[in-house]
């Protein structure tokens, strides 16, 4: 085995072939970091047949003028079951970054630690406890099992829906009642989905602005989304849910005809048997449905007049690779939330994964707090409704490469933090 630099082609071919390959360990992310001006390294291990068997994208940032901080975002991509390979990789990686004036090395591997349900109950161990001892022996310090959302650290908990050997019907059957109803609702209510182009990205951004204001969370800036759409190319999809009013109103009119027919039948049943309580209840129920139907038709016509035949209502931002579809961000128009557009977006992308043979649908980050007063309690409930599971990752590891200078650096940083 040998530790070596990799070409972008070698790196991309390998990472696309591996499980637990994160979107930040892709050629698209490499090209993005180059464009942003970062010092970027593609490294890995090749076996005796010159085949890549491990790969890692590293970025380097200047620290204290003469040193660098090296970071691998969710790397490396490697067979973690091969402990000998893991040892060799990190040992050689430390030697490599030392040659490049590294002060310290930071990694947060895409490696599961344990599995939980959405109530925070542990359901299984991923079998990677050995990794903590291994990294300690190699000189890495674990930063702890942090929870919540951090502006610097990657989120440690993902909500993931397993699609392996499942059909669309299987997915719906496993949803809770609300998710089932809303998914079926958007399928029949004229809600359509198409993908936005780069020029149309402001539509998505306006929804994110609506959502961040109503839910009080900090969103990324425009540049974050535009750059990833540009450099990730077809590895980013931005689905838009919208109402086609011609189809929506047509479907409502057809529904009204059926309801009127059923109502007339119920009225005739009452004429024949006035004492039939069941027929009276049926009449009342059908009348309520008709009233609701009429309100929807009136609303549809009014909105069509105000907004034209197509009304955007929700959009999402997704990363795609052969391992998983990642729901990174999404927003909905507050004024039209009742159309349940976000459910149309989710259903479109779940089916995208199924149709492209991708076995994992990642709803992405949750805080890991699992309490009613957690900042993401509503989001956790939403993701739980799809029958997803929680994966907790091993977390962050830091290795001081130049120990004396790193000790001085951390001491100065603590003093600075206390002052400010």
From Swiss-Prot:
One of its GO terms (molecular function) is aminoacyltransferase activity. Pfam families: FemAB. It is found in: Cytoplasm. Signal peptide: none annotated. Its main location: cytoplasm. One of its GO terms (cellular component) is cytoplasm. Its EC number is 2.3.2.17. GO terms for biological process: cell wall organization; peptidoglycan biosynthetic process; regulation of cell shape. Keywords: Acyltransferase, Cell shape, Cell wall biogenesis/degradation, Cytoplasm, Peptidoglycan synthesis, Transferase. It catalyses: beta-D-GlcNAc-(1->4)-Mur2Ac(oyl-L-Ala-D-isoglutaminyl-L-Lys-(N(6)-Gly)-D-Ala-D-Ala)-di-trans,octa-cis-undecaprenyl diphosphate + 2 glycyl-tRNA(Gly) = MurNAc-L-Ala-D-isoglutaminyl-L-Lys-(N(6)-tri-Gly)-D-Ala-D-Ala-diphospho-di-trans,octa-cis-undecaprenyl-GlcNAc + 2 tRNA(Gly) + 2 H(+). Homodimer. Interacts with FemB. Belongs to the FemABX family. Since cross-linking between the peptide strands is critical for maintaining stability of the cell wall, FemA is a potential target for the development of new antibacterial agents. Catalyzes the formation of the pentaglycine interpeptide bridge, which is characteristic of the S.aureus peptidoglycan. Adds glycines 2 and 3 of the pentaglycine bridge, using glycyl-tRNA(Gly) as donor. This is Aminoacyltransferase FemA. It comes from Staphylococcus aureus. The gene is femA.
């Amino acid at each position: 085995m040998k530790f070596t630099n990799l070409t972008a082609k070698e790196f991309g071919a390998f990472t696309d072939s591996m499980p637990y390959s994160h979107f930040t360990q892709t050629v698209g992310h490499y090209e993005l970091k180059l464009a942003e001006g970062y010092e970027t390294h593609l490294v890995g291990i090749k076996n005796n047949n010159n085949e890549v068997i491990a790969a890692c994208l590293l970025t380097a940032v200047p620290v204290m003028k003469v040193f660098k901080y090296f970071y691998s975002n969710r790397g490396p991509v490697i067979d973690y079951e091969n402990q000998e390979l893991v040892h060799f990789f990190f040992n050689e990686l430390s030697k490599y970054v030392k040659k490049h004036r590294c002060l310290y090395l930071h990694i947060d591997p895409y490696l599961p630690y344990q599995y939980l349900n959405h109530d925070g109950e542990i359901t299984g161990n991923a079998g990677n406890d050995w990794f903590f001892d291994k990294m300690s022996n190699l000189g890495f310090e674990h930063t702890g099992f942090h929870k919540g959302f951090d502006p610097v650290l990657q989120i440690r908990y993902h909500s993931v829906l397993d699609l392996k050997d499942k059909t669309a019907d299987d997915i719906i059957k496993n949803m809770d009642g609300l998710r089932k109803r809303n998914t079926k609702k958007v399928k029949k209510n004229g809600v359509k989905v198409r993908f936005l182009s780069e020029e149309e990205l402001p539509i998505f951004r306006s929804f994110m602005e609506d959502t961040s204001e109503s839910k009080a969370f900090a969103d990324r800036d425009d540049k974050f989304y535009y750059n990833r759409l540009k450099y990730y190319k077809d590895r980013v999809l931005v689905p838009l849910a919208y109402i086609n009013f011609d189809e929506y109103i047509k479907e409502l009119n057809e529904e009204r005809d059926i309801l009127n027919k059923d109502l007339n039948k119920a009225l005739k049943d009452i004429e024949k048997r006035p004492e039939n309580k069941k027929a009276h209840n049926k009449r009342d129920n059908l009348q309520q449905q008709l009233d609701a139907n009429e309100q929807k038709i009136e609303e549809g016509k009014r909105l069509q007049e105000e907004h034209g035949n197509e009304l955007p209502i929700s959009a999402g931002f997704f990363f795609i690779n052969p391992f998983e579809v990642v729901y990174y961000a999404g927003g909905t128009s507050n004024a039209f939330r009742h159309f349940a557009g976000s459910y149309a977006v989710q259903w479109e992308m779940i089916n995208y994964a199924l149709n492209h043979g991708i076995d994992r649908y990642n709803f992405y980050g949750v805080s890991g707090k699992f309490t009613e007063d957690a900042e993401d309690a509503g989001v956790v409930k939403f993701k739980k409704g799809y029958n997803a599971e929680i994966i907790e990752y091993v977390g962050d590891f830091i290795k001081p490469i130049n120990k004396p200078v790193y000790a001085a650096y951390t001491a100065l940083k603590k003093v600075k933090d206390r002052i400010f």
